[in-house]
Structures are given as C-alpha cells and as structure tokens.
C-alpha cells in the first residue's frame, strides 16, 4: 500500500490545472497588462476610451487603473482625465535599457558631445507617439535645455522624435502619422502632415533632424538615430540649446558631432533593407 504525502502550498485544481483563484488572478493580470500596453502606445486615453478599445466593462477598467495608479504604473491627468504610464513603468523600462547596456554606453558619449558642442546632450527612445528621454549630460551654461529622465516630448516637435520617424518602417510611419495629433506648440511647429513628411524625407537624406524652435520658442535641437543590429532606429541622441548659440553657422559642425556620436552608439550598422522589402 502506498502512502500519499500532500506537499505544502496552495491546493491544486482538478487534473493538476489552475484553481479558480489562480485563474482569476491570471485573468486580472492579463487585463492589467492589456490596459498598460494600450496607454503606453498612446498620448493619453480616458477610462471610456480604454474600455471601448479593449471591449472591457468600464467598472473593470476603473478597478485596474486604480490598482495601477496605486503602484505608480499609471497616472491620470486631472484636467483631461486621460491616463498615461506612470513613473514606476519608466523604472521598469529603464531596467531593460540598463540590461541592454545602451544608457551605460551612452553616458561617456553624452558627456563628450556636451563638451564638444557646449550644449545639453540627450538620449531618447520611441514611447508610443512620444519620445521618452532616458539620460542627458547638462551643459554648464546658465540658459540651457533640460530633459530629465522620464520626460516625454511629442514626436513631431522634437529632434529625436523626427529622427526616429524619418527612419521608421513605411507602414509604421503611415500608422503613426494617421494616429498622431499634430499639436501646435509654436509658430514653427509642423502641424500639416504633408509638410512633416517632406521634412522627414530631408532628415533621412542628410542624416540628422533639426527641431527649429518647433517645441519651445528660442530653442533648437539637432538629433540623429541610433541603429540596432537589425538596422532599425532604436533610439536617438541629440544636443539642445538656445538658437542664439546654435546658430546656422554652427549647425554643420554640431550635426557632424551628433551623427558621429550616434554611429558610435549604434549596436551595429547592418545594411537596411529596401523600403519595399521592409513594408
């Protein structure tokens, strides 16, 4: 006669499967991750919009959002009632970037780029329809650009954002242009899709993007893409500062410095496929 000894721990469900409590927990986790994935690739969605897009009951979405907000993974704008990813989500993302080594490898190059150009150097990645800044080396100048880690900026009105858009897959670019809200920040902001596309073509041809007071009056930014082993634009590096210091006479030398830093940071300059193949 054999004697069965029950191991300590949670009771097992029938046929060794998940119990009701476990299944319910996994479903709740799935819902939370679905909601987090959705708001991470948007510029902000209301509770109603989230419920409609995910075909969830508003009450369920509300419970999940309250839980995510309590952990700092999501947060809402008190004025627009739109939900965004929170600071804890950025820390989680930063952990991945640390593992990839990009931020660590970029630090000395950001410092060197800042010293060569005299302006603040920045590192950023695509985050939904915005640029998420990961690291920076601040200039010693009193008047300077400031993008602390975790700051987000609109793609169409930032140097890194336009550099990433210019090198996006054709189908991805079409989708982003269709979904983006081309908000006007200054008189120089490109709010016409055709004008933005024309600018992106020029950016791709010359190798760097220029934010010419398109986000903040009196401030310029020069950026270049950082490519991964697959030849995809995975991140961007830039220098930002007052237009008075980043004059037209200095653009050539400064853009060369930014492009060189981007090349050094690229994980690999694998040949990019033809646009038709990539689509």
Swiss-Prot record:
Keyword Plastid assigned: no
Basic residues composition bias: residue spans: 1-13
Top-level taxonomy: Bacteria, Pseudomonadati, Pseudomonadota, Alphaproteobacteria, Rhodobacterales
Superkingdom classification of source: Bacteria
Primary gene name: bhcR
The entry's DNA-binding region: 47-66
Region feature (Disordered): 1-21
Pfam families found in the cross-reference section: HTH_IclR, IclR_C
Species of origin: Paracoccus denitrificans (strain Pd 1222)
Role: Transcriptional regulator of the bhc gene cluster involved in glycolate and glyoxylate assimilation via the beta-hydroxyaspartate cycle (BHAC). Glyoxylate negatively affects the interaction of BhcR with the promoter region of the bhc gene cluster.
This protein's name: HTH-type transcriptional regulator BhcR
GO molecular function: DNA binding; DNA-binding transcription factor activity
